[in-house]
Structures are given as structure tokens and as C-alpha cells.
């Protein structure tokens, strides 16, 4: 990057707007606009993380009742890319039927979203990483989608817990050596700059592509 995208007292991403919600993956129009999606269990802090990355307080709706998000919510960032808040899955208060429906919607999206470039898999650092999440990581690699494992709420871990988490991360990276993992605390801001840079780098890629098209035409 040739310039600092964030000046003092300015948000990292200046132009952010909610665009649309979809109840089914096949309703999403193919626009050729790159997407970064946020997936994870209903209590992992997906929507809070999206708001923190974009430095907006309530862009993505955060509910006190986990599992409320049932739609694919699209946010247009810097006139370049979409950030997609996916429905949460796996919350214990939801029925098995609800869980299957949300997982089905997620997998349909992964299979049909040709513009999806990166998936932020958001996981509470206080919890074990279930097999479903590991399978999602593998699915991303198979489809040439960059997975980023985001371990949230690390401010709630003591040093002993943090040491245990790092050991578990090492085991996961032995399974997926190319996996990028970011430890995040919305409270302290730790890890947010790394995630913003991933988003910004994709915006720069789009910007450079458009400039090349203009030069050719």
C-alpha cells in the first residue's frame, strides 16, 4: 500500500452503506463485485466484529438474543466491495431444524457466490473449534476462497487460557498450513488493524483493476 488509508479522526472506510438482504443464496445477483463474508456461530460476535472493523456502532444489527440473524446482509464498502454478514449457526437455543437450515444457507452461499474472495470465520476464543468450522476451512481452500480464522473475545482469556489457545492454533495450522489466524478483542482493538488491512487490500485490488480497464479503453 502506497498510502495510509486512515487519517487521524477519520474512519478507515469512509463510504459504507447497507445494500440488501437475501433469504436464499440463489437470489443474490452476480455483479462481479468482490465479497468478504463473516460466518460463525450465533454467539461468536460476528455482527459486533463487522461493526468494529467498519467503525460503525450499529451498521450490522447486534441482538441480545443469539441466532436472530436469518438473512444474508450485504454492505457496500468504499464503492468497491461487499461485506456480507451471514446468519449464525449452532446456537444451543435453536432447534436442530433451524441449525440445518442456517448451515444449508451458508453452504449454498459458498457454492453459488462466485464473487466471494475471503471468508472471516468468527469463533469465540473461549470455546473449542468444532468440527463444522474445520470443515468450512477445508471447503474454502477447495473453492479457492481465502479463509481467515478470527478468534474473538480474547480479552476474556487469562495467560494460561491464552497459552492453551495458541497450542490449539498450532495444531490447526498443522492441518491447514496456509490458514491465517487473527486474535481479536473489540474492547481493546487488538487484531482489528490486521482485519482492516485484509479488507483494504481487496479494495485496492478492485481499484487497480478498474484503473487498468480505463487505461485500455
Curated annotation (Swiss-Prot):
GO BP terms in the entry: division septum assembly
GO cellular component: cytosol
Record's keyword annotation contains Membrane: no
EngB-type G domain residues: 32-205
Binding site for Mg(2+): 47, 69
Annotated residues for binding of GTP: 40-47, 67-71, 85-88, 152-155, 184-186
Transmembrane parts of this sequence: none
UniProt entry keywords in alphabetical sequence: Cell cycle, Cell division, GTP-binding, Magnesium, Metal-binding, Nucleotide-binding, Septation
Reported cofactor(s): Mg(2+)
Pfam families: MMR_HSR1
Keyword Cytoplasm appears in the UniProt entry: no
Gene3D superfamilies linked: P-loop containing nucleotide triphosphate hydrolases
InterPro entries per UniProt: G_ENGB_dom (IPR030393), GTP-bd (IPR006073), GTP-bd_ribosome_bio_YsxC (IPR019987), P-loop_NTPase (IPR027417)
Highest taxon listed in the record's lineage: Bacteria
GO MF assignments: GTP binding; metal ion binding
Family assignment from sequence similarity: Belongs to the TRAFAC class TrmE-Era-EngA-EngB-Septin-like GTPase superfamily. EngB GTPase family.
Function: Necessary for normal cell division and for the maintenance of normal septation.
HAMAP family named among the record's database cross-references: GTPase_EngB
Name listed for the protein in its UniProt record: Probable GTP-binding protein EngB
Organism: Leptospira interrogans serogroup Icterohaemorrhagiae serovar Lai (strain 56601)
Organism lineage string: Bacteria, Pseudomonadati, Spirochaetota, Spirochaetia, Leptospirales
Gene encoding the protein: engB
